[in-house]
Structure formats: C-alpha cells, structure tokens
Amino acid sequence: MTKDQKLYKSLIIADLKIASDNYDSADKALRLQAAYHAQQAIEKTIKLKAELCGLNLWGHEIDVLIKKCDDAKIKIDIPKLIRDKADMYTQWEAECRYYPVKVVRKDSIKRAIDTVIKWLHSGNTI
C-alpha cells in the first residue's frame, strides 16, 4: 500500500470510530452523523480496495460503485450486507446530514460498522 493509500485507510478508520462512538447515542443528531460516517466508511472501503486492484472509482452511490467493481471483474469480496443494503447506505450519505427527520435504526448502523470493520481487515489487499 502506498503512503497515500495508508492515509486514506486512516480516514476510513476515523469514520468507523466516529460511527462506533455515536450510533447508540440518545442524541438523534449524533446518531444521524454516525450513520453518515458508516456510509463514508463503506464508500471509502470500496474505493480503496478497488484502487488496490487497479480501479479508480469516483462517486457516492454504493450500488454504482459495486456495479463498477463487478463490471471490471475485480475481486474485492464486497459483503452480502453491503450489496443487499446498498441503496439504504447511499441514502445515509446526504439524508443523514441534511434531513433531521430521517429515521435510521441503531442496529442498522451497528451492523454496517461491524461489517466494514471485518471487511476492511479481511483478504490480502489491505
């Protein structure tokens, strides 16, 4: 991994820490920020793993990023939960920052966090 890729990975870890520290907060604004940072961790992990396989991705839509990886036939073992909930996670990117009436379940955020942590440290690419 290059120095820049290691720095990028540190951003993912920071997103996961923010999400982990706040997903079960009594403060709804903090929970929404936790969901946003969980989404960012998903997005950035896809992008980092793809880059390590030679594919440079841009954008925020999780399903589009997954499709680009699939179309390029790169093997980054995107977890089933991420694939199945891609649309929901994509919504977290903007809705959790700008729409305080958005409802996000604590357990959904926690599952996303746990899945990314496991995925980030799996395989031989990271």
Where do the language-model regions lie?
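Terminal alpha-helical segments
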Residues: 1-126
